[in-house]
Amino acid sequence: MPHLTSTKTSTSSTELRTGLGVPGYAHPLVAPAEWAELARPGTPLHWAVLDVADGPGARPDPHCLEAAGRLRNAGVRVLGRLDSAHGTRAYGETISEAQRYIDWYRVDGFLLDHCPTDRATLPEVRRTVTTLRAIRDNAHIVLGHGTHPHPGYAENADQLVTFSGSWSDYRWSQVSEWTADYPPDRFCHLVHGVPGPHLEEALRIARWQGAATIWFTDRTDRGGRVDPWETMPGYWDEIVSRIGTGVSE
């Protein structure tokens, strides 16, 4: 089973190779500075998600194509976002969207967002992942559960998002025991509402729980009314410096 592999951009100098996984900025026309920063040399990125219009959109978007190209040229892995709708999405729809991501934006893999977590849906997710790997050689697959799923999912993807939520929940979160059987580069944590003074604590939690790919931001979802991932964290330079130099370790 393939694990997280390095790109041309060095991800980190730490033993755990801690790096950033960007869940998806706003459209490049809305967030041009954010997309430009991701292509800056030396940024410790594991991957960045491209979400054109809740998926690949109905037609190619030249601005998204340009943004994705800049990231690839900088050695950053670009993932297309596919909404699994907690297992209710039709298999054919998912694969059709994936093919459009490949044809239009030459993505390196996929984030299956809102991925189900229970054992009963595991065969269908396995079927989807198998097809994604068939239509895109060496596809990097991230399953966006947002919580700890049935352990069987770990055998069907490169990485699992085992936490996605607020800082108030993250600071008291617990890790499932089965994750100790896998290296940290198999797990991702996405946390919003992390205050700047608590950034070091958040990095420490990720290290203790064994997650090498992270995304921490001080932006909040305002009670579910906004997307906290659409803009850059206020402490962007600090978190890049901490991860890039191994300070978090």
Regions found by a protein language model. Give the residues of each.
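Glycan-processing catalytic domains of CAZymes
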Residues: 1-249
